[in-house]
A protein has these predicted regions:
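Zn2+-dependent metallopeptidase catalytic core
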Residues: 97-107, 140, 167, 177-197, ...
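Surface-exposed beta-strand/loop patches in extracellular or lumenal glycoproteins
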Residues: 69-99, 170-187
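Post-HExxH zinc-binding segment in Zn-dependent metallohydrolases
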Residues: 291-302, 326-327, 338-390
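C-terminal recognition in membrane/secretory proteostasis and scaffolding
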Residues: 357, 367-632
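N-terminal, polar/Ser/Thr-rich
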Residues: 35-66
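Extended, low-hydrophobicity, Ser/Thr/Pro/Gly-biased non-transmembrane segments
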Residues: 92, 138-220
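Juxtacatalytic substrate-recognition/specificity segment
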Residues: 75, 225-346
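A surface-exposed beta-strand-loop module
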Residues: 63-65, 93-153
């Protein structure tokens, strides 16, 4: 194969891809340095490159409006060897294993002798003499349960849906740097919002690699759209709404999103993409970040209310554009169908994104859930203290378990990578500000991390420690030994004193929304999907469940005589419990049937107030004022 067109040239079929000649376009610098990746040689500024040994790949996704139970996919390959492996990517965090829903796989070629064989759940072998073939399959969407839909999962409705991403495409194993084209066959009234590169055909898009392909899902349907620019870089907000959507002030929503982008650009000095797409979905929860887009649940009622929660989640996911998509843990490498190794660095990826979700909104003057940074820190410290696992489990250990398949990995404790990492960031930010007399902050750490670890090599915990030490000119090894690699409680007052504050902690009876004593629900049911039933996760051995002799991994049989069938049904039973109730639990452990009596006794929760230390110095007061303003 001599070449293929640049992304600016349309491609309806693979034949057109192969027939066109290669166009070489040298990228000229824009008026600003925004959105430009560092280049090491002038040859790297070529818009599209192809090796003669690479296959030509074209995908087609077809949505039939008369059957929205799934969609059809075809992948056309030319120029590959006689035997090819096709696979579906395993996501390092949210591996939903959608290969389970691939149906009716079949193959076509000019010889009529091609064969496709499933080798594993997410792996297929293709034998096609001549190396050219078309594989077709259907992705049968799973039935929705619980009345809620995750914003990152594919769906179809009469007015739109979400397709593509890791849930949809088979890729060629060993050819992850091969470019491809994707053509969408959709109802005529539907439009497309995706981070994939557009072509002259409005329904065809270009992906320079498998990673870009699977990290660029496509929101399709009757979309509302708004656009803005930051540093001359275009941003696109697409919204898919339900039929009963509540009207909201779209100008205010888009303005808030734009302010976040401006603050992030100001922090890092530039934007790392050529265009960004916000894929907002009504009737969905949660979100998932991508290198140049985000899939985010955005209920119209929350948008109408000006919800701080929506902006908080958006800011968190958007910050992942830098912190995870580019500044990535060393364990995160190129795509693979194999489950990737668990990362020890998610405390940084998730925790720092939580830290900046709050900070960027404050800098932008956007709604937040607490009036001041001090109040926000009070809430975070109280949450940390309320769960002993946060101090008994190291941030690195919790990172490894964060997206694991088995909640039993942490025993009868639970902990939050997001919370641990946020508080580690908060304390290190205070350390840096103190050591540099307010001249530097965590902002300087993020910029240096972006410069060093957004390329071929990801970061380790030692790298983070080294960068912080360089920025502050101080030693932080004892802190990392104790709270990142080790499992000791963070001594908050040691760092709060830099700004003339201390944490006053009191323990009070836990109350529900009605003001009455709350039931002790420091345990929850879960399922592993292995058909073994519902298990119990104890999050605190000092809870009523732990005191009754229950342990994480116990298989639940009945609660108060009600047979346990599903996780959702179990949650329904637990929500009916009140403080003072006595609960009879039938369970199985090690193949032995057992029973336990759980007494829903009252329990205490921590409340934290930041108080001023005695006789704070002028330097402490000045540093506090700078910190409270969220100054860089």
């Amino acid at each position: 194969m001599i070449g293929s067109p640049t992304p600016l040239v349309g491609c309806r079929t693979l034949a057109r891809v192969l027939a066109a000649s290669l166009t070489i376009a040298v990228v000229a610098p824009p008026p600003s340095a925004a959105a430009q990746s560092p280049l090491r040689h002038w040859t790297e500024a070529i818009d599209a490159r192809f090796a003669m040994s690479q296959p030509a790949i074209a995908y087609v996704i077809r949505v039939d409006s008369t059957d929205l139970s799934g969609f059809d996919v075809s992948v056309t390959v030319r120029g590959k060897r006689d035997t090819t492996l096709l696979a579906m990517v395993a996501h390092p965090e949210y591996d939903d294993r959608y290969s389970r829903f691939v149906r009716n796989v079949r193959i076509e070629d000019t010889t009529g002798r091609a064969i496709v064989t499933r080798l594993d759940s997410a792996l297929w072998r293709v034998v096609a003499p001549g190396g050219s073939f078309v594989v077709r399959y259907r992705l049968q969407l799973p039935a929705e349960t619980g009345g809620e839909r995750a914003a990152w999962k594919p769906f179809l409705a009469p007015t739109g849906g979400l397709v593509g991403g890791t849930h949809t495409f088979m890729y060629i194993v060993g050819e992850t740097l091969a470019p491809s084209y994707v053509t969408l066959e959709l109802p005529a009234s539907w439009s497309v919002a995706t981070a994939l590169t557009p072509t002259s055909d409005a329904r065809t898009f270009f992906a320079p690699s498998t990673l870009v392909l699977v990290e660029s899902p496509m929101l399709v349907g009757r979309l509302r759209e708004w656009r803005f620019s930051v540093d001359a870089v275009p941003h696109r907000v697409a919204y898919w709404s339900l039929p009963d959507a509540v009207p909201f002030d779209s100008a205010a929503v888009v303005a808030a999103i734009q302010k976040l982008a401006r603050e992030a650009s100001a922090l890092f000095g530039r934007l790392p993409y050529r265009e960004y797409v916000y894929q907002l979905q009504d009737g969905a929860y949660g979100a998932l970040e991508h290198p140049a887009s985000v899939s985010l649940g955005a209920r119209s009622r929350e948008l109408a209310d000006g919800s701080a929660a929506f902006l908080g989640e958006l800011a968190h996911e958007y910050f992942h554009t830098w912190n995870l998509m580019r500044i990535r843990p060393v364990e995160y490498r190129d795509v693979s169908y194999r489950t990737p190794p668990r990362s020890r660095g998610l405390w940084f990826s998730e925790g720092l994104s939580m830290f900046y979700s709050d900070l960027l909104r404050r800098r932008a003057g956007l709604p937040v859930s607490t009036p001041t940074r001090a109040a926000h820190l009070e809430t975070a410290i109280a949450r940390y203290l309320s769960n002993p696992g946060n101090a008994r489990l190291s941030a690195e250990r919790v990172s490894v378990a964060e997206y694991g398949d088995d909640p039993a990995a942490l025993g009868d404790y639970s902990a939050s990578t997001h919370l641990q990492g946020e508080l580690i960031a908060a304390m290190m930010d205070l350390e840096i500000r103190h050591a540099t007399s307010g001249r530097r902050s965590m902002d300087d750490v993020m910029r240096r991390m972006m410069e060093r670890y957004s390329g071929e090599r990801g970061f380790t915990g030692r790298d983070v420690e080294r960068v912080i030490a360089e920025v502050c000119g101080c030693t932080v090894s004892p802190f990392f030994d104790a709270h990142v690699r080790g499992a000791r409680a963070i001594p908050f007052d040691d760092y709060l004193r830099y700004i003339g504050l201390r944490a006053e902690v009191t323990w009070r009876p836990a109350l529900g929304r009605d003001g009455r004593p709350a039931p002790d629900l420091r345990a929850f049911p879960y399922e592993l999907g292995d058909g073994a039933g519902v298990r119990l996760k104890v999050s605190d051995p000092a809870s009523a469940w732990g005191k009754a002799g229950l342990h994480t991994g116990d298989r639940l049989r009945a609660i108060n005589g009600h047979p346990i069938a599903t996780r959702d049904a179990t949650l329904g039973v637990l929500r009916q419990l009140a403080s003072g109730d006595t609960v009879q639990v039938e369970f199985e452990r090690g193949g032995v049937h057992r029973s336990a009596t759980v007494v829903m006794a009252p329990f205490d929760r921590p409340f934290v107030q930041l108080r001023e230390v005695d006789a704070p110095t002028s330097a402490q007061r000045a540093l506090r004022a700078q910190w409270e303003k969220g100054a860089p």
